[in-house]
Amino acid sequence: MTGYGANRLTVNMDAIIQNFRTVERFVAGKTGIMAVVKANAYGHGIVDVAVALEKNGARMLAVSNVDEAVQLRDAGICVPITVLGGSTEAGIRETVSLNAAQAVYDENALHILQREAVRLNKTALAHLKIDTGMTRIGVKGDDALARLLSVWKDCPNVEMSGMFTHFAAADTDATFTETQNERFKRACACVHAAGHRPFAHAAASAAIAFGDNLWYDMVRPGIALYGGTDCIKGLTPAQRLTSYPVRIAWAEDGDTIGYGRTYTAERPMRIMTVPIGYGDGYKRILGNRAQALVCGKRCNVVGRVCMDQLTLDVTHVPNASMGDEVVLLGRQGIECITPEEMAVWADTISYEVMLGFDSRRVKKVLM
């Protein structure tokens, strides 16, 4: 198989389920699991992943926005869904119809939920978001929380089914993480004193590994489900990005390669051209930094990554030929390029790497 249209992103659903099982074993029944499928399941396909997780025992799912919740309900997903992000008025109203829980952190959202619940003669579900240090969304400070809890007394159709926070640096700053945790504990005490009994959740993937003092009633694995982190032993990357060469030719000593002439051959080099580029999600910054796998060997990306093509040095792979699979992310033989490794090359994080190949020009294949 050669030529354009050769690019494939293979999503290993078995790996995602095994990662879910790995998290289950890690928490050992001490807490529940809310599987995070936001951002198209981190680029893996929100509906396919959600269906597989529900089938394999996931009891609750988390998304970022209401559109994602609609996708899941339209696909027949029945388990509880929590919208972790803020929503527009129309979106907040829709969560009531969807029987999804909406993150709430201000009076406006609370009033919208109350009005819509009354209109539909239903109970709206809300998860109270506490800002303990992200300074993004959430109720911040004791006074603001007290005011919101006071308003909640006048919203009998809104059930506080959950409350949550998010840690800013669970993988890098233990002291600040503990500070955030103490703030969340204080907020939980205030909520309980006001008569609410929500389940609490705070730990995403890195915080799960931090320790069980952060687990509360439920944890929220996201990146861990897709193998984009090694914070828990035994996780496996679920994506494999492949292509096939469209040209293999020799460059002479002194030839320059690609836009800007950023790479100069210092010897005769065998160059493989691969039809994938930043138009497909393979980042431009990876030029002269990244590697790919050809015939089980690591080959350097030489020259700039173009919109539609990149070039590899395959001089040390004399048997490389047209028709050989090129692995840009994932395993080939004993070698493996992980999302974390690619993230280092790209000066980013594995999350962005995995989300980057959600392109119409890269065919997604489930296995």
Predicted features along the sequence, with ranges:
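Conserved helix-loop functional segments at active or binding sites
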Residues: 22-25, 254
